Amino acid sequence: MTPQLATTICGIALKNPVLAASGTFAYGVEFEKLVDLNALGGFVVKGLSREPIEGNPPPRVFESEAGMINSVGLQNIGVRAFVAEKLPALAGLRTAVFANVFGYCTEDYVEVVRVLNDHAGLAGYELNVSCPNTAHGGIYFSNDPVLLAEVVTAAKRVATRPLIVKLSPNVSAIEPLARVAEESGADALSLVNTVISLAIDARTRRPRIGAGFGGLSGPAIKPIALRFVYQAARAVRIPVIGLGGIATGEDAAEFLIAGASAVEVGTATFWDPRAPLRIAEELGKFLEREGIRKATDLVGTLKF
């Protein structure tokens, strides 16, 4: 019997639990000639801000030993250009499309969500809280429970679609922050974002990234991500979406076992744009080999 991959997140039906992550899948439409977008479990468009952002100086990407470091600087066309130029092409898709939202103050997040509310074609929002709050001395929303509660509460108040809060691994403990996000209105969590890192060129004695520090992603962070997903899933009652170094169907299975209800694939799409589809197929084969009828039967089954 063919295993069932279908699942739901916040009442949103997904064909399978494998989504393309924000930041590596552009606005989705750019991949339509390479990937059957309707076959995806879903995808998250790259982060959207109140106004266009040009991003950081080059070099922006460095390939590390087991992943990559990037500091693109959240370059994007801005939310208004997105709804005018990109969203119309997404509105007819038969898969779940999520908009990643970020800002540098609470009002930024609220305004982006308000603009998106007025347009069809989206299943929900993913709030990237791994950004510095410029009104509070650059403290990251994701690292401060008070700021996290403020931005999630404000976004939830205006959102007309489910709200997923994307948490950072650059914290000492994830459970308190996961609970704050849930108590402030999050409908689901996604984690982890990238790990703040530094790569150095020994010959020039300069960083290999133009902005200095960057975010590490890929296989190197998978064990870190699994730990955080497991801890967050045990701390909250809302669904958790896992990401961080997923490149195979068995990787995806590990995240489900840790407690994730779905997963997102990011860095792997750089060398294989069809990675989310391949991973979903491999997950199905893994379930079949293991005699598991449904992907949902794996969720939260880790044994100690």
UniProtKB/Swiss-Prot annotation:
Binding site for FMN: S22, K46, G47, N100, N128, K166, V192, G218, G244, G245, G266, T267
Cofactor: FMN
Keywords: Cytoplasm, Flavoprotein, FMN, Oxidoreductase, Pyrimidine biosynthesis
Source taxon at top rank: Bacteria
Entry-linked InterPro entries: Aldolase_TIM, DHO_dehydrogenase, DHOD_1B, Dihydroorotate_DH_1, Dihydroorotate_DH_1_2, Dihydroorotate_DH_cat, Dihydroorotate_DH_CS, Dihydroorotate_DH_I
GO molecular function per UniProt: dihydroorotate dehydrogenase (fumarate) activity
Pathway(s) served: Pyrimidine metabolism; UMP biosynthesis via de novo pathway
Binding site for substrate: K46, N70, S71, V72, G73, L74, N128, N193, T194
Listed EC numbers: 1.3.98.1
Biological processes annotated in GO: 'de novo' pyrimidine nucleobase biosynthetic process; 'de novo' UMP biosynthetic process
Broad class of where this protein is predominantly found: cytoplasm
Pfam families on file: DHO_dh
Active site: C131
Cofactor note: Binds 1 FMN per subunit.
Catalytic activity reported: (S)-dihydroorotate + fumarate = orotate + succinate
Family: Belongs to the dihydroorotate dehydrogenase family. Type 1 subfamily.
Function: Catalyzes the conversion of dihydroorotate to orotate with fumarate as the electron acceptor.
Subunit structure: Homodimer.
NCBIfam families referenced in this protein's UniProt entry, alphabetically: PRK07259.1, pyrD_sub1_fam
Listed name of the protein: Putative dihydroorotate dehydrogenase A (fumarate)
